[in-house]
Structure formats: C-alpha cells, structure tokens
C-alpha cells in the first residue's frame, strides 16, 4: 500500500470518516480539500437501493445543472444538410455523416457528447462497439437522437449531464468545479439528486437513496447524512 503524502494526511485529518455531514458542510469540506494546482471537479456519489441487472431497476437519464458544469464540452453531431448547418451554428465542434463515421472508425473520437438526427442512426449504429463503451451512443430517451439538433447542442454545452447507475448500485457525476461558490455547488447537487429521485424505477424496493458522499477530484470522500438530502 502506497504511503500517504503530507497533503493527503492533512486532507484525511480534516474529514471524520465515521461522521455523516450535512450537505452544506460536506460541500465546504470538499472545496477545502481541493488543493491541487488545477481546478478540481466536485463530484457526488450516491448508493441506490437498486440492482441494475434487472431491467425494471435501471436508473438512467439526463439533468441540466442550473449553474453549469464548468467544463468545456465538445459536441459531435451526425447530420446532413440544413441540420448539419444548424449544429455548426449552435456551436458543435464536430459535424458530419459518412466522413465522421470514417474518422471515428480510424480511431479518432474528438468529442464528449454525441448527437444524431434520426435518419443518421443506421450509420451511427455501425459505431456501437466504439461509442457504446465510451457512453457516447446517441439515445432518443436522453434527447440525443433528435431533429432539434441546435437545442440538443446548446443543452449539452449548457450544463446538461447524463447519468446511469453502475453494477453496484452506484451513480455519480461531477456537479461543478472547486472554484464555484458553495451555493452554486449546492444548487447543482440538489438538481442532480432531484433528477435521481424522479428517475426512481418501478422495480426499486425498500430504501432508494441509501448513501451519499461528495469529494474533489484528488480529495477524500465526505459522507453525507441522507436525512439532509431533499427527496431522500
């Protein structure tokens, strides 16, 4: 086991690993422990009472964080003609059809979100083995297969994040940067949790929101008292 650095020891000492903190105090501690030279992301992790191996217990969706993510999101769009022009005008960095297919098949995936018009899905489907594992496959349920490409591009760049529960019932997301004011991080935290609560699947039994924590990219996790979480 690697030795902890002095900075890591100081960070660990500032957080009581046995204590459940209120949301505001937890966010303040996560910000306090974001001491790297880069602007660390503040992340939230939730442990849900679901088993995603069952189709009726899958938790997936999108949410727009009201204060944005602080990230520069590159958007790729599969579209032709006027819809391709709309995507470019809305700020999409990568727009194309067969040419974009060939670029991706050649090993270059130069975007963080992928949007497609419905008529492009036959083409995009051939990229499933490349885009799927990266979480980039356009999906009509997530609003990324649409004729409203301009709106989708602006949403992707304006603070919209996708979420999907993992095998152990964990769901996580960045909710902003450490440089954000604490109240902005709280607003994003509340919006994210609210979306998760609204996405509660029909097959979920017992307690839904079991555990919660926040952390910075390089900092320790700060456990949250779920009784202090709206909608828990």
UniProtKB/Swiss-Prot annotation:
Which InterPro entries does this entry report, sorted A to Z? Ribosom_uL1_bac-type (IPR005878), Ribosomal_uL1 (IPR002143), Ribosomal_uL1-like (IPR023674), Ribosomal_uL1/biogenesis (IPR028364), Ribosomal_uL1_3-a/b-sand (IPR016095), Ribosomal_uL1_CS (IPR023673)
An example GO biological process term is:
regulation of translation
| This protein's record includes keyword Ribosomal protein | yes
Which keywords does this Swiss-Prot/TrEMBL entry list?
A: Repressor, Ribonucleoprotein, Ribosomal protein, RNA-binding, rRNA-binding, Translation regulation, tRNA-binding
Name any GO cellular component annotation: cytosolic large ribosomal subunit
Q: Which GO terms describe its molecular function?
A: rRNA binding; structural constituent of ribosome; tRNA binding
Pfam families attached here? Ribosomal_L1
Give the protein's biological function. Answer: Binds directly to 23S rRNA. The L1 stalk is quite mobile in the ribosome, and is involved in E site tRNA release.
NCBIfam families for the chain: rplA_bact
Recorded family membership: Belongs to the universal ribosomal protein uL1 family.
Q: How does it assemble?
A: Part of the 50S ribosomal subunit.
HAMAP family (alphabetical): Ribosomal_uL1_B
Name the record gives this protein: Large ribosomal subunit protein uL1
Q: Which organism is it from?
A: Rhizorhabdus wittichii (strain DSM 6014 / CCUG 31198 / JCM 15750 / NBRC 105917 / EY 4224 / RW1)
Q: What is the lineage of its organism?
A: Bacteria, Pseudomonadati, Pseudomonadota, Alphaproteobacteria, Sphingomonadales
């Amino acid at each position: 086991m690697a030795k902890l650095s002095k900075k890591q020891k100081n960070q660990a000492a500032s957080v009581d690993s046995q204590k459940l903190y209120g949301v505001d105090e937890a966010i303040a501690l996560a910000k306090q422990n974001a001491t790297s030279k880069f602007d660390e992301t503040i992340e939230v992790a939730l442990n849900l009472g679901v088993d995603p191996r069952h189709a009726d217990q899958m938790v997936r969706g999108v949410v727009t964080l009201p204060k944005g993510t602080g990230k520069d999101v590159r958007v790729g769009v599969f579209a032709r003609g006027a819809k391709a022009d709309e995507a470019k005008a809305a700020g999409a960095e990568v727009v194309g059809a067969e040419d974009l297919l060939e670029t991706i098949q050649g090993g270059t995936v130069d975007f963080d979100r992928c949007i497609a018009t419905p008529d492009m899905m036959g083409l995009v489907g051939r990229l499933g083995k490349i885009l799927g594992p990266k979480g980039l496959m356009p999906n009509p349920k997530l609003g990324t297969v649409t004729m409203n490409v301009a709106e989708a591009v602006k949403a992707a760049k304006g603070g919209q994040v996708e979420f999907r529960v993992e095998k152990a019932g964990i769901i996580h997301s960045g909710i902003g940067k450490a440089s954000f004011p604490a109240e902005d991080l709280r607003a994003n935290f509340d919006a994210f949790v609210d979306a998760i609560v609204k996405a509660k699947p029909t097959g979920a039994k017992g307690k839904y929101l079991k555990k919660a924590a926040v952390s910075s990219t390089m900092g320790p996790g700060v456990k949250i008292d779920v009784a202090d979480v709206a909608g828990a």
